[in-house]
UniProtKB/Swiss-Prot annotation:
Belongs to the TrpC family. This is Indole-3-glycerol phosphate synthase. Transmembrane segments: none annotated. One of its GO terms (molecular function) is indole-3-glycerol-phosphate synthase activity. InterPro entries: Aldolase_TIM, Indole-3-glycerol_P_synth, Indole-3-glycerol_P_synth_dom, Indole-3-GlycerolPSynthase_CS, RibuloseP-bd_barrel. The keyword Hydrolase does not apply. Pfam families: IGPS. It comes from Gloeobacter violaceus (strain ATCC 29082 / PCC 7421). CDD domains: IGPS. One of its GO terms (biological process) is L-tryptophan biosynthetic process.
Length: 295
C-alpha cells in the first residue's frame, strides 16, 4: 500500500497576482490519503499554536508512563483486549450518539479490558487530545493514542496528554521514519504499536530493529472493508518468526464476538483491538465481559 504525501504546488504569477494551480495529482486517491493530507495541514496549525520546544517541555510534567506492552503480556485473558474510545469513523459515521469518552473508558475498565485506545483525530473520527487527557485522569489502564502520526511532534503531543503508547502506521511512513519514530517513543518510555495491512508491510517492519508490538489491521484502509483473513494469512506466513522474536501481535478491527477472538487467537494473535462492536452496545462493560468470556 503506497500512500502519497500532499504534493507542493508552486504559485504561478500572472502580472502582480499569484495563483495556486491544482493538477490532477493534487486530489487524494483514497480515504487514507485524504486523512494524511488533512493531517499534514492540521500539524502546521498545531505547530503555530504550540512550538515543538514548548511541547517537549510539557512532557516533563506529564503523568508517569504506564506499561502498555506489559499489560497485554500479563493479561489474565486468553487474548488481551484493547477497547477503543471513538465517536465516529469515515465509513460508519457517528457510532455512539450519547458519546461520553470518560464514561466509556470507565465501562471498558469495569468489563475487564486490559488497555484503552483513544482516537484523537478530530476531522474524520471526532476525537481529540482533550479526550485523551480526561481519560488519563479518570482511568487506571494504559492508554494508546490512536492517531495518524507523521512525525515526532505528535508523539510528544500524545505523551503530554497522558498516552503510554502510540500507533505507527507502516502504510503512511517510510522505513526511515518508522525507525526514527520508534526511537522517539522509546526515549519517552512509550510503546509503539506498529500497524501493518499486508505481507509487504509486515516484512518491512520485521527488518527494523526494536519492534516489540505489531498490529495487523483487518480493515483495508483504502476502502475500509474488513476481513479477519488478513490476520490469519499474515500469521500463517510470518507467525513463527514473530513468535521466535518475541513480538506481541495485536489483531485490529472486525472483532464482534467471542468466536472472532478465538479465530485470531488460533492464528497466533496475543491481543485484539476492538471498537465498533463495543460502541454500539447499550452496556459496553457487559460487552467487554461477554467478548472475553466467549473465547
Amino acid at each position: 500500500m503506497k500512500i502519497r504525501r500532499r504534493p507542493e504546488q508552486p504559485p504561478v504569477a500572472v502580472g502582480p497576482l499569484q495563483f495556486q494551480l491544482q493538477g490532477a495529482d493534487v486530489e487524494p486517491g483514497n480515504i487514507l490519503e485524504k486523512i494524511v493530507w488533512a493531517k499534514e495541514q492540521e500539524l502546521d496549525r498545531w505547530r503555530e499554536r504550540l512550538p515543538l520546544a514548548k511541547l517537549r517541555a510539557r512532557t516533563a510534567s506529564a503523568p508517569e508512563v504506564r506499561n502498555f506492552l506489559g499489560a497485554l503480556r500479563r493479561s489474565p485473558h486468553p487474548v488481551a483486549v484493547i477497547a477503543e474510545v471513538k465517536k465516529a469513523s469515515p465509513s460508519r459515521g457517528v457510532l455512539r450518539s450519547d458519546f461520553d469518552p470518560v464514561a466509556l473508558a470507565q465501562a471498558y475498565t469495569r468489563g475487564g479490558a486490559d488497555a484503552i485506545s483513544v482516537l484523537t483525530d478530530e476531522a474524520f473520527f471526532q476525537g481529540s487530545f482533550t479526550n485523551l487527557s480526561r481519560i488519563r485522569e479518570q482511568v487506571p489502564l494504559p492508554l494508546l493514542c490512536k492517531e495518524f502520526i507523521l512525525g515526532p511532534y505528535q508523539i510528544y503531543l500524545a505523551r503530554a496528554h497522558g498516552a503510554d503508547a502510540v500507533l505507527l502506521i507502516a502504510a503512511i511512513l517510510s522505513d526511515t521514519d518508522l525507525a526514527y519514530l520508534m526511537r522517539v517513543a522509546d526515549q519517552l518510555g512509550m510503546a509503539a504499536l506498529v500497524e501493518v495491512h499486508d505481507l509487504e508491510e509486515l516484512d518491512r517492519v520485521l527488518a527494523l530493529e526494536g519492534v516489540a508490538l505489531v498490529g495487523i489491521n483487518n480493515r483495508n484502509l483504502l476502502d475500509f472493508e474488513v476481513h479477519l483473513e488478513t490476520t490469519e494469512t499474515l500469521l500463517t506466513e510470518r507467525g513463527e518468526r514473530l513468535a521466535e522474536w518475541g513480538i506481541t501481535v495485536v489483531s485490529e478491527s472486525g472483532i464482534y464476538q467471542g468466536a472472532d477472538l478465538a479465530r485470531v487467537r488460533k492464528a497466533g494473535a496475543r491481543a485484539v483491538l476492538v471498537g465498533e462492536s463495543l460502541l454500539r452496545e447499550a452496556d459496553p462493560a457487559q460487552a467487554v465481559g461477554r467478548l472475553v468470556e466467549g473465547v
